[in-house]
């Protein structure tokens, strides 16, 4: 069976997941820092705007906007190749690190962008690595609330619209992050990303289909609402 091309809709954000294959993908602070350096370099070369990120031992997630159709693939391939080679050399390992290729999907920004950003920033809490997002070093949460500047992050217009000043935006994001997430919408996001089908309203999908590089949903489900199962039953990524 021919593999479908990766989704691409011009100027639309994507949620991206890389899942670990066996064992933790990061063993020390140097690993985390090197992965971020690889990400920053690859994003610059591939014209990939990074809006949110999290690195966890078993998986990583990103919220990005590609500048062109191959931006995500180019960046992910460059990051994985460069990081895995160095990780294996540093720790005396060999072989693959990630479970297949990356998973990604286009999301409707007005409805899902800020949700996806919060899901990413709170993934360490949801995975019981920490009790609060602000205490986890390896995510974009502290950037979004003004405690740190991640120079490779490009703030999305929807984040910028949270306030007229950096302080207002940071406080507004902090207030949003304090609200409980809609678990149904979280499952929608995770399931859509893992399966590679666009996430958005019917109107958005109809609009996006005009410029997308492939069909946006399975043929059998095009006229039906997708059945949503809890993504946590299928993956440890939350």
Kindly give the residue locations of the regions a language model identified.
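Short Pro-Cys-Gly-centered "Cys-loop" motif that presents a nucleophilic cysteine in a tight turn
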Residues: 1-56, 65-238
